[in-house]
A protein has these predicted regions:
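Expand to "…catalyze enediolate/carbanion chemistry for C-C bond making/breaking, isomerization
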Residues: 1-264
């Protein structure tokens, strides 16, 4: 582990011990995480004794599910589940890849559009016996409502988020929400409690609470972790980008000389 990764590990240990986090999240979807990034992240998560949740690229992303299995993910989230058919496809793909082991996993869907809300009860019915958690994605949900990101903490988004959460709870599912979670989202988080079981930043999944001090401290620490994660990722790819530059320059010079020798 390098120095940045050690700092990341220290923050995760503090987040777990003080701020009651559950898991670290990665994405094959919007974030587009690559396997080498996930391997590096997974080592830190393992040392912190936390779970890894991964959002796959779609309801039937079998290759992503294979990668999740290899990485030992504890929870898998499917994005943009907008119909009972999409839910059915997710169930089928999960059972195909995990076979009998699917029962040992936490299966999560993203409820993140007005279309999903419209079809929610049918989706939740289709997920019976398989689905564990409904995670509400506020960024896409607000966009699908025709609202700007500035309105993500407003009453319209809160009302729809609460309705989705209530219906999910009626079916016995756990409820999580995220998207645009920063200090200014604290009043929204407090209003949702205790209807939700969890909330999440881009990378960190927390147990639900309405304690303002815990929320502020936890969100700031999550932001520190995410900043270091991005720094480590950038430095890793910067090293890869420059490691062959000296040889590339030498080969270009040799080629130029060799080419000039061919000129008659």
């Amino acid at each position: 582990m390098n120095n940045v990764e050690r700092k990341m590990l220290d923050i995760l240990k503090e987040l777990k011990e003080v701020y009651n986090i559950i898991a670290i999240k990665a994405e094959f979807e919007a974030e587009g995480s690559r396997t080498d990034e996930l391997v590096m992240l997974n080592e830190i998560i393992f040392r912190a004794d936390l779970q890894l949740f991964i959002k796959i690229g779609g309801c039937e992303a079998v290759r992503d599910l294979d990668q999740c299995r290899l990485l030992g993910a504890s929870g898998i989230m499917a994005p943009m589940i907008e119909s009972p058919f999409a839910m059915k496809k997710f169930v089928g793909a999960a059972k195909k890849v995990y076979e009998k082991e699917w029962q040992n996993m936490e299966w999560i869907i993203n409820a993140e559009t007005v279309t999903c809300h419209k079809n929610l009860e049918q989706i939740l019915e289709e997920g019976k016996g398989f689905l564990s958690t409904v995670s509400i994605g506020r960024v896409d949900l607000s966009a699908s409502m025709g609202l700007s990101r500035k309105e993500i903490n407003g009453e319209e988004v809160f009302g729809l988020t609460k309705d989705i959460a209530t219906k999910a709870k009626d079916y016995g599912y756990k409820v999580n929400f995220g998207g645009g979670i920063s200090i200014d989202a604290i009043p929204f988080i407090q209003k949702m409690y205790p209807l939700n079981d969890r909330f999440e930043t881009r990378k960190v999944v927390f147990h639900a609470t309405d304690d303002e001090k815990m929320l502020k401290g936890g969100i700031v620490k999550a932001m520190e972790f995410e900043t270091l994660y991005l720094k480590n990722k950038c430095e890793y790819y910067d090293r890869m980008a420059v490691e062959d530059q000296a040889r590339l320059k030498m080969m270009a010079e040799r080629l130029e000389i060799a080419g000039s020798d061919l000129v008659v």
